[in-house]
Curated annotation (Swiss-Prot):
Residues 1-11 have a biased composition (Polar residues). It comes from Methanococcus maripaludis (strain C5 / ATCC BAA-1333). Belongs to the universal ribosomal protein uL2 family. Residues 13-28, 224-240 have a biased composition (Basic residues). GO terms for molecular function: rRNA binding; structural constituent of ribosome. This is Large ribosomal subunit protein uL2. Residues 1-28, 206-240 are annotated as: Disordered.
Length: 240
């Protein structure tokens, strides 16, 4: 009897495949959407900038005027000691948080809420930004980094600017050890071994005197879990 596939082991939920969230600094999201933000604004001061393992962008510890502290994603150009504003009457300046309906068209934004008050869900990676395209009655259209235009509630909050940490992909890893340590902070099983490079006991494509599949790559959607590799329930394969 063969061994279980990686996809089967992943479903068991062992520590190897779990995201090591215990290494994180904490939840990175907006403060609660209260009357101070809905009617005016609240000031906060950046007291520290931290590296968060497993996250591609640095985070800042912000202390607000009511002595509340939050971890937030910061834009390029922010430094310790600067003030940020959160609320409907905040200035259009990098780092400030406003509802989408109050942000002019063409302004880059990030950490966008999908539901007002959810803390920010979209565009959170280092160097990323979206653009406010247009406003209409009861909706705002935002162009995401993928090119997809998303319709959102104008009350959803976003931060003005570009997420810090851009250009991280321009520097190559060079060494496998650096790649290993980078991915050890995430729920990524690495290195990824090809099925044809394994032994027959480890994978349906393993074994043989040379590396080849040895069987059709298309499999039924209803086949057994240990055989479900390759093109699963594919309508067609190969070039078009």
């Amino acid at each position: 009897m063969g061994k279980r596939l990686i996809s089967q082991n992943r479903g068991r939920g062992t520590p190897k495949y779990r995201s090591p969230t215990h290494k994180r600094k904490g939840a990175v999201k907006y403060r609660s959407y209260d009357e101070m933000e809905k009617d005016g604004k609240i000031l906060g001061t950046v007291v520290d900038i931290l590296h968060d393992p497993g996250r591609s962008a640095p985070v800042a510890k912000v202390r607000f005027a009511n002595d509340e502290e939050r971890l937030v994603l910061i834009p390029e150009g922010i430094q310790v000691g600067e003030e940020i504003e959160c609320g409907i009457s905040a200035e259009i300046k990098p780092g400030n948080v406003l509802p989408l309906g109050e942000i002019p068209e063409g302004i880059p934004v990030y950490n966008i809420e999908t539901i007002p008050g959810d803390g920010g869900k979209l565009v959170r990676s280092g160097g990323c930004y979206a653009h406010v395209i247009s406003h209409d009655v009861g909706k705002t259209i935002v162009k995401l980094p993928s090119g997809f235009s998303k319709v959102l509630n104008p009350a959803c909050r976003a931060t003005v600017g570009v997420v810090a940490g851009g250009g991280r992909k321009e520097k190559p890893f060079v060494k496998a050890g650096k790649k290993y340590h980078s991915l050890s902070a995430k729920a990524v099983a690495w290195p990824k071994v090809r099925g044809v490079a394994m032994n027959a006991v480890d994978h349906p494509y393993g074994g043989g005197r040379h590396q080849h599949l040895g069987k059709p790559s298309s499999v039924s959607r209803h086949t057994s879990p240990g055989r479900k590799v390759g093109h699963i329930a594919s309508r067609r394969t190969g070039r078009k």
